[in-house]
Amino acid sequence: MSMQDPLADMLTRIRNAQMAEKSVVSMPSSTLKVAVANVLQGEGYIAGYQVSGDVKPQLSIELKYFEGRPVIEELKRVSRPGLRQYKSVDQLPKVRGGLGVSIVSTNKGVMTDRAARAAGVGGEVLCTVF
C-alpha cells in the first residue's frame, strides 16, 4: 500500500512516540520531512535529527521532554492532499496568539510563519506546532 500523505505519517509517528515516552522515533526519510525536522529543531521542539542509509534513507528524530512531559503539546496537519491550504503573507495564521508556530512551505523553502512574514512570502501551511 502506498502512503498518501507522508508528512501526516511523520507527525503521527512523533505524537505516538511522545505518548509512549520514546526517546527516538524513526521513519522513512524525504526532503520535505528533513526540512520540517530542521524547522522543529530550530524552534526547540526536538533535540535533533539524523538521516542514515543510502538505499532507503531513514530519518531518526530525537524527541525532547521537559520535567517528564513532551515539549510538543499539539502537532496538527493543516494542508492535506484533499484540501490544500495556501495563505498569503497577510493571512498566515498565528498559533495560540504567537506562542506556537505554523510551518509553511514557501518558494524560499520550508520555514516558520514568523520567518515567512519577515521574508514577505506566503505559501502552503503544512502544520501547526504548540
Curated annotation (Swiss-Prot):
InterPro entries from the UniProt entry: Ribosomal_uS8, Ribosomal_uS8_CS, Ribosomal_uS8_sf
A GO CC term assigned to this protein in UniProt: ribonucleoprotein complex
GO molecular function terms attached to this record: rRNA binding; structural constituent of ribosome
One BP annotation, GO: translation
PROSITE patterns referenced in this protein's UniProt entry, alphabetically: RIBOSOMAL_S8 (PS00053)
Keywords: Ribonucleoprotein, Ribosomal protein, RNA-binding, rRNA-binding
Function: One of the primary rRNA binding proteins, it binds directly to 16S rRNA central domain where it helps coordinate assembly of the platform of the 30S subunit.
The protein's assembly and partners: Part of the 30S ribosomal subunit. Contacts proteins S5 and S12.
Protein family (similarity comment): Belongs to the universal ribosomal protein uS8 family.
Protein name listed in UniProt: Small ribosomal subunit protein uS8
The species this protein was found in: Stutzerimonas stutzeri (strain A1501)
